[in-house]
Amino acid sequence: MKITEQSIKEMSVRNYHKRVVITGVGPVTPVGIGKDAYWESLINGKSSMRQISFPNKEMSQYRCQIGAPIDGFDLSHFVEKSKLSKHLGRTSQFAVAATWLALKDAGIEFNMNDFEKEEFHHKHTGVYHPKNLDPYQIGVILGVGVEAMDLMEHFHERFLSRGLRGISPFALPNIYLSSITSHVAQYFSIRGTSYAVSTACASGTHAMINSFLQIQGGGEDLMVTGGADACITPYVFGGFDVLRAMSVRNNDPNKASRPFDQERDGFVMGEGSGVLVFEELDHARKRGAHIYGEVVGWGMTADAYHLTDPDPNGKSLGKAVKDSLEMAGIHLEEIDYINPHGTSTLLNDRVETRMLKDVFGKQAYHIPISSTKSITGHLMGAAGGVEAISVLLAIEKGISHPTINYEFPDPECDLDYVPNQARRKEVRFGLSISAGFGGVN
């Protein structure tokens, strides 16, 4: 458009920043599905890591033989079966279930599509459709590391043995990264913005930042956001194994994830989804929604250092933290709780501790810091969403969950990691930190 003094004034009025709150949470994790079960496991430090195996694969070739899978998961326990559901990979199944939980928690009501009625079918193509809400004012942005690797590996093996006859026409469409948001949008008749974000283990957090911006700029009233991942497959698990990024404490799985502990030797891979409902403040108030908290700041940076290792000085990660605090307009001493990336790898925990001391100075020693990954394992692209839920529940309950398995202090990791026991403390402002391969923060 042509820029004039009048147009500048008009656009300034039109583009005022809207406030963004969280009105629903849906955790699907190895330690609990739904916010109540998840929270109970968090505050009690209850993990569910165990030895794993892959069909027709010799496990002795894997250095790490433990993980945190979600046992007994069945999508039909959450939503009605449909033609769509039978083609979904495990990642999308987690995302659909978590979305259902989050929307239900947010008080969003849905009607189920009656596919027997032709006129109804033409109006509503999804399995469910929202009542009393404009589907074009609801969007979905989700983070994912590697979508539907279970399907990809399955069809790759069939291709090697049977050629093209072994490949389903549904194989390729369901392994696009964007298919995860397409599946969620189709299931719940969400017709606003829909796309996936893939920035390794920061994917869920980056998706939430993009959803925040979408609402803040007036794009939608409500966003389904967070992340999902299901990486416990022979190839993906093997890829991390050859990187020597995972713990080899195979005989003691529940002690293997030990962020900031001197005996840590790598992360434990988990799987699942953490979905949140972001909503414009006035929209949430008008419908009487429960508000968990408000998103007040964010920061994103790149290390520009290494494909897998974090920059040892942590400066770029620290810049992202500083940017989020500056945007929020809050002082260092106002942060009451930090949920760190806290992976249980030798380098990450050391760099993250150094960064927090650099950003917060002496105040860093007075802030409770607890790693959700000590309990859930590392949920990869889902981690940011699940850990944001941890922060919101800490704010709501006034309790910081523990970092479990913290037994041997590391002189280079000397902050308050809320060791082994939950702690009651009022939380007004919480900070969630994510980082990923490629130096994405």
Task: Label each region the model flagged.
Residues 19-23, 50, 251-328, 336-337:
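Condensing-enzyme catalytic core mediating Claisen C-C bond formation in acyl metabolism
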Residues 35-40, 150-164, 214-217, 237-250, ...:
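A glycine- and small-aliphatic-rich helix-loop capping segment at beta-alpha/alpha-beta transitions
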Residues 161-168, 209, 213, 230-286, ...:
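Glycine-/small-residue-rich "gating" segment that lines the acyl/pantetheine channel
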